[in-house]
Amino acid sequence: MAAAALRQIWARKFLPVPWLLCGPRRYASSS
C-alpha cells in the first residue's frame, strides 16, 4: 500500500536524473 506510493514518489524523483545526466553527455559525445 504505502510501499507502492513511496515507489512512485522515488521513481518520479530519480527517473529524470538519468535523463539529465545522459542527455547532455550524449549530446556532447555526438558533436
From Swiss-Prot:
Gene Ontology cellular component list: mitochondrion
Q: Which cofactor does it need?
A: pyridoxal 5'-phosphate
Give GO terms: molecular function aspect only: L-isoleucine-2-oxoglutarate transaminase activity; L-leucine-2-oxoglutarate transaminase activity; L-valine-2-oxoglutarate transaminase activity
Q: Report the locations given in the UniProt record.
A: Mitochondrion
> Has UniProt tagged this entry with the keyword Nucleus?
no
Query: Which family is this sequence assigned to?
Result: Belongs to the class-IV pyridoxal-phosphate-dependent aminotransferase family.
Q: Give the record's keywords alphabetically.
A: Amino-acid biosynthesis, Aminotransferase, Branched-chain amino acid biosynthesis, Lipid metabolism, Mitochondrion, Pyridoxal phosphate, Transferase, Transit peptide
State the organism's lineage. Eukaryota, Metazoa, Chordata, Craniata, Vertebrata
Q: Does the keyword Transferase apply?
A: yes
Its gene name is: BCAT2
Q: What is this protein called?
A: Branched-chain-amino-acid aminotransferase, mitochondrial
Q: What is its EC number?
A: 2.6.1.42
Q: What is its main location?
A: mitochondrion
